[in-house]
Amino acid sequence: MGFFSRGLLFISLAINTYLDGLRSFGYHVFNLSLHILNSILVFYIFQKVLVQFRNQIQTSKNDVSISFIAASIFLIHPIQTESVIYIITRSEILASTFYLCGFLIFQNFLELKIPKRLLKKTFLFLSIIFFAVVGFSVKQTLATFPLILFLYYIATCPLDSFTIKLLYKWRKHLIIVISVFLTLLFYKLLNDETFLIGPSNPDEMVGRAKYMLSQPSVIIFYYLKKILFPINLNIDPDIEVVTHIFSFGFISGIGSIVFMIYYFLKQGEWRFYLFFLAWFFIILSPSSSIVTLHDLAAEHRIYLALPGVIFIVSYGIFCFLKNLTYIKIINMLGLKILVSFQIILLFGILTIERNKVWRTELSLWKDSYKKSPEKIRPLINLARAHSIDGKQEVAIRYYEKSLLKAPGVFVPNYNLGELYLKDNRMEDAIIRFKTALQLNPNIPETYSKLGEIYLEQKNWKLADFYFKKCIEIDNRFPQVFKNLGILHFYHLKNLKESLLYFSKSLALDPKQKDASEISKLISKYQRGKLNLPSQKGP
């Protein structure tokens, strides 16, 4: 695995593992610390925004309250729970740290206009490249970073600047080139499933065309709705798949996006609004267009896109409050404090409630199954959570229910086979494990389980067959080698072969149970004092 295949992410997880083992506390502290840091970065970024957009917006450049509201919303918004609590979604938080650091440095870079500060500008420029490259090693979201920087530069340039005049002069040519490029790109994406990312698995994904057609409605009617009204959050939402371009979901999603762009274009602060709207859409674009993912929607994907909406909302709140003070309803400072307190209190309560849902695996999947009763994954994971909680009968019931909905899924077949095996329902377990083998013949544990069952049933030949199939796929199972040793030593009477299996088992796990007995057997054989027994072994 290369450094740019999320190398830095796995390094951070490895450090946590080295320090804390598998105890989750250290992982959560790391994630939470990064999230707090990102909130501070959001505050300072918006402070810079107020300065660099000062000629376009209706506020003082020193108005800390707007930045405070924005950073507070980012910090305590309930939709951030999945990104912060779910350990593996550290990729979102860590990549965002580098993204936001690089963006803040770029804002400082734009303020250095004196030629004498060339050395400092060079240092800042190299720092931006560093954060972009290192951030890309965490998550490929950083691929959008150069475009965001370019758009910010354009948005903050005076209308009479050379850059704006040049773009205006060549606007028709640029529109044609961009339109042709996007048309060809989307045509290729929709007609070639393998373009850029390789083929998707049709059993696990909806396919790129349907995925892309579904995303406009996902962005508007799920992501944006959950940002503005963060209730009924769900780790596994049930999203309707859009199958054709003339469907209501696609047309309404695209129509809403076009309306927002048109509405903001009519505002006096249109460049401010359009930039942060672009921030939201562009950062979402990798997971909402080119890259076909297993889930149509996931709340952690909007972690870094969230500031785009937050900045617009925070500034909108400010403008609304300013208009109220014009009619002498209440003084501006008091109104800001009141609204800020209400937002923090409301989002804080909702976040606490959402954290309660994430407290255990069982509570999380109970919540998801309640909200997505037609989806198969919440049902399977709820069954697994009950199994971990020691409620085997409840787990069996949910797994059996999942197989009625989706009999062709590997996981419930295998897990149900394990539960049947624990419950001594051997024939039922065999059926489930053999079904699992048909669905995925490359899982060594399935062969191992069947070998154990046939060993228990004294069907030596089948036990031997399945154990050997297991180690053909993966030869790192000490228990399977031990079982083969027992089988060949005590039942099939193959002395040399059995000792080879025992030796391999001992080499893989020298501290296993019965290790001393196995060592004695090998030692006796080496001294020539070992005879094949007639009874069952260790």
Give residue spans per PLM region.
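C-terminal luminal/periplasmic domains and tails of membrane-associated envelope-modifying transferases
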Residues: 330, 362-538
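Polytopic membrane enzymes that build or remodel cell-surface glycoconjugates and lipids
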Residues: 1-419, 432, 445, 449, ...
